């Protein structure tokens, strides 16, 4: 199902022991944890692009403590996936949403992210899914109409590529931070709902919209994890227990 990520190639990849190879002999490593690295050298804007290991660990602790559980349940309800679905999480991070939903539903799951550290964590925790390191801002390494569902959860969006890999009538779930998300830590945010809907006007129809919010009492260590996960500078004197709002805008589209 994977395609070669070398520019101008895009031929199907086949497994050859610990690597993936295309008919033109372009080769890609399979890590010990099981993920496939398709990231091209010219696509690296930094030595280790994407989320840092520290941010990934902080986000994982927040997930494990249940602060984002209502978001996960709302996403599951919105996409209504079954075991027959083929699901792509573009910008999957540590794999929390895709991995837990796959465990519950048994669908064919594929996650892609530019951060090798994030994808490695996902592969170790959720080995039933296929995990790929690649730049989702570029051409996605999948054939046309490969997926029945695509997820884009607080990540970068690539509307034309989402449409290309999504089957006709397939579902796209886009989650963006609501204006009151983490308002106690970073102030009120911009409402990007209308702008996001406009980006998907070509090739998609908006079929549902829902805001999912909850407030939680965080101890100082959890507040620190939130700050690290959103790359805010840490000041020891300001890291104290606080009641914090977690809020997402869920936009469900159908491929036209």
Task: Indicate where each model-derived feature is located.
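Conserved alpha-helix/loop element of class I SAM-dependent methyltransferases that forms part
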Residues: 65-83
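Class I SAM-dependent methyltransferase SAM/SAH-binding core
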Residues: 86-88, 93-139
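A short glycine-rich, Lys/Arg-flanked "PGG" loop and its adjoining helix->strand segment in the class I
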Residues: 159-171
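N-terminal auxiliary segments of SAM/dcSAM-dependent transferases
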Residues: 1-48
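Conserved beta-strand signature within the Rossmann-like core of class I S-adenosyl-L-methionine
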Residues: 170-180
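A short acidic, Gly/Pro-enriched loop at the edge of an enzyme's catalytic core
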Residues: 138-149
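Class I SAM-dependent methyltransferase Rossmann-like catalytic core
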Residues: 45, 50-71
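Conserved Class I S-adenosyl-L-methionine
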Residues: 212-256
């Amino acid at each position: 199902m994977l395609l070669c990520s070398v520019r101008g190639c895009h031929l199907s990849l086949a497994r050859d022991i610990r690597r993936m190879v295309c008919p033109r002999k372009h080769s890609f490593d399979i890590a010990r944890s099981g993920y496939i690295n398709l990231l091209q050298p010219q696509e690296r804007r930094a030595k280790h692009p994407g989320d840092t290991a520290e941010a990934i660990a902080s986000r994982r602790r927040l997930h494990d403590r249940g602060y984002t559980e209502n978001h996960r349940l709302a996403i599951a309800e919105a996409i209504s996936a079954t075991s027959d679905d083929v699901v792509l999480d573009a910008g999957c991070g540590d794999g929390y949403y895709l991995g837990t939903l796959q465990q519950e539903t048994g669908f064919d799951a594929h996650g892609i992210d530019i951060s090798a550290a994030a994808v490695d964590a996902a592969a170790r925790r959720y080995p039933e899914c296929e995990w790929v390191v690649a730049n989702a801002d570029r051409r996605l390494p999948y054939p046309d109409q490969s997926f029945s569902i695509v997820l884009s959860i607080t990540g970068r969006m690539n509307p034309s590529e989402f449409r290309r890999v999504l089957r006709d009538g397939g579902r796209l779930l886009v989650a963006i931070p609501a204006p009151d998300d983490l308002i106690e830590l970073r102030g009120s945010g911009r409402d990007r709902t209308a702008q996001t809907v406009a980006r998907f006007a070509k090739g998609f129809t908006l079929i549902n919209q829902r805001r999912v919010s909850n407030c939680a009492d965080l101890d100082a260590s959890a507040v620190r994890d939130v700050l690290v996960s959103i790359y805010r500078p840490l000041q020891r004197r300001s890291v104290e227990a606080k009641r914090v709002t977690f809020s997402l805008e869920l936009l469900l589209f159908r491929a036209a």
